[in-house]
């Protein structure tokens, strides 16, 4: 064919567009190599070349062959087929496959005593994002959200609790400082490092505040119960009433002196110390703090307890009781024991 051949451009392009190989239904688009999960691990699925043509390039290649007399027309050699963008040999793809297998090959079980929560492959794979280099990394916000959900489910400080009183009533108590609270910032760091290092383990989360019992009923069976209305305090050890005393609580008619209700926790106990009494510092034999400067103590200067004494001889908010009963409590409780106070 002479290079000076003349052709009708429109008719030629129309004829080319009607070729079988140019029909969309006869084309298979190429697919990129990618990562898939198979049999509990991630693998690279190779790219597929496909049979889809680049319309403009193909048309131009055929026209050029007509004009120049070039035969045969090798569309593949001439680069007319669409190509995958990512091949299985791609360095980033290879690194990502290694990374995702490492990051997800971890099982971390959170132990909450009577229930557990598990972080595993199915969860971690949804926590992955890519960095500025296109490589997989853990998404901090996703892990933060998970830990926040754990805290919402298992934190108990200040929450509303159903409580059975010494006289058989079922009441609701809320507020106070007793219970469990996850240190979300510290736990975010711990969980992230465990996943990155591939450390499978059973663990408790990092707590910023701990109670005595980690079960769903975190009051348990050893606790101090204070009924402000009856002016009575009962101490249970392992479910058995061990001390029972009439008390004098805070004076509710003096500003900031009412004993607060709620579920509190015992702090560092002291013996033979001085505390703020009703009107002046007073020496006590036993001191069991439960809320800042408030606590439970004996009151050697008092002869009477109970009744309505708290209304005109009340404390600044602390609880006073006879020495023999406070001594029993002092000798049997440990730090973080619940103190349930209600009216």
Q: What do these predicted regions represent?
A:
Residues 1-264, 268-282, 286, 333-335, ...:
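Surface-exposed, secretory/extracytoplasmic low-complexity segments enriched in Ser/Thr/Asn/Gly/Pro
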Residues 287-332, 337-340:
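Active-site scaffold segments
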């Amino acid at each position: 064919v002479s290079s000076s051949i003349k052709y009708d451009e429109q008719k030629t392009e129309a004829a080319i567009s009607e070729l079988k190989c140019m029909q969309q239904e006869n084309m298979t688009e190429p697919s990129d190599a990618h990562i898939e999960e198979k049999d509990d691990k991630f693998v690279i699925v190779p790219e597929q070349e496909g049979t889809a043509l680049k319309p403009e390039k193909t048309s131009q290649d055929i026209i050029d062959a007509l004009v120049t007399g070039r035969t045969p027309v090798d569309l593949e050699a001439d680069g007319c087929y669409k190509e995958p963008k990512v091949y299985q040999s791609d360095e980033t793809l290879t690194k990502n496959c290694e990374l995702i297998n490492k990051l997800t090959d971890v099982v971390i079980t959170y132990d909450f005593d009577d229930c557990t929560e598990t972080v595993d492959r199915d969860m971690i794979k949804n926590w992955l994002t890519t960095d500025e280099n296109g490589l997989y990394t853990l998404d901090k916000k996703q892990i933060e959200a998970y830990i926040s959900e754990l805290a919402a489910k298992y934190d108990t400080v200040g929450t509303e609790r159903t409580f059975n009183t010494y006289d058989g009533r079922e009441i609701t108590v809320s507020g106070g400082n007793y219970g469990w609270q996850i240190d979300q910032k510290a736990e975010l760091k711990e969980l992230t490092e465990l996943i990155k290092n591939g450390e499978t383990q059973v663990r408790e989360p990092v707590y910023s505040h701990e109670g005595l019992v980690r079960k769903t009923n975190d009051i348990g069976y050893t606790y101090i119960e204070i009924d402000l209305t009856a002016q009575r305090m009962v101490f249970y050890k392992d479910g058995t009433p061990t001390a029972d005393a009439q008390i004098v609580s805070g004076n509710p008619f003096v500003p900031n002196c009412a004993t607060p209700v709620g579920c509190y926790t015992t702090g560092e106990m002291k013996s033979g110390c001085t505390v703020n009494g009703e009107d002046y510092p007073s020496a006590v034999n036993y001191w069991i703090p439960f809320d800042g400067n408030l606590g439970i103590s004996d009151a050697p200067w008092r002869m009477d307890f109970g009744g309505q004494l708290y209304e005109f001889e009340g404390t600044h908010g602390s609880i006073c009781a006879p020495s023999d009963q406070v001594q029993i409590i002092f000798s049997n409780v440990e730090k973080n024991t619940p103190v349930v106070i209600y009216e």
